[in-house]
């Protein structure tokens, strides 16, 4: 089994919204508070384009856009770990849009969400 590296001091946390984003309250304010906490701990943040989107029905954007965002941010060297910024009830809708072949050959990273 491959184990990802832990989040380094002053590392970068990537945020994605493969399901519900943070476009409405109380999620918007809670996400802003989480960002303040992480930056206060010295971490940099990289927010995906769907984090504040509300273009879908119960999902931040289209399944295609959400799958592409998750693939891009997981495979990116610009962040050390990934966190889903919102809910995950409709994440199953994006699974066939995620490029698992590309993810499989990428350096592993922690993903929570």
Where are the regions a protein language model picked out?
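ATP/NTP phosphate-donor binding region
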Residues: 1-78
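Short linear functional motifs in flexible/disordered or boundary regions
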Residues: 25-27, 82, 94, 106
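General beta-strand structural signal in soluble alpha/beta enzymes
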Residues: 45-49, 83-85, 111-113
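Long, hydrophobic/aromatic-enriched structural stretches that serve as scaffold segments
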Residues: 67-98
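Short, glycine/charged-enriched secondary-structure capping and boundary segments
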Residues: 28-30, 96-99
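Charge-rich, low-complexity amphipathic helices
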Residues: 37, 59-61, 92, 96, ...
């Amino acid at each position: 089994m491959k184990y990802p590296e832990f989040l380094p001091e002053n590392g970068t946390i990537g945020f994605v919204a493969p399901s519900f984003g943070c476009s409405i309250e109380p999620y918007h304010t809670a996400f802003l508070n989480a960002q303040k906490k992480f930056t206060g701990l010295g971490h940099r943040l990289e927010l995906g384009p769907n984090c504040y989107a509300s273009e879908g029905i119960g999902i931040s954007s289209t399944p295609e856009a959400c799958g592409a965002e998750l693939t891009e941010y997981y495979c990116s060297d610009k962040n050390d770990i990934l966190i889903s910024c919102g809910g995950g009830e409709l994440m199953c809708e994006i699974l066939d849009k995620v490029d698992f072949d590309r993810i499989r050959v990428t350096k592993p990273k922690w993903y929570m969400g």
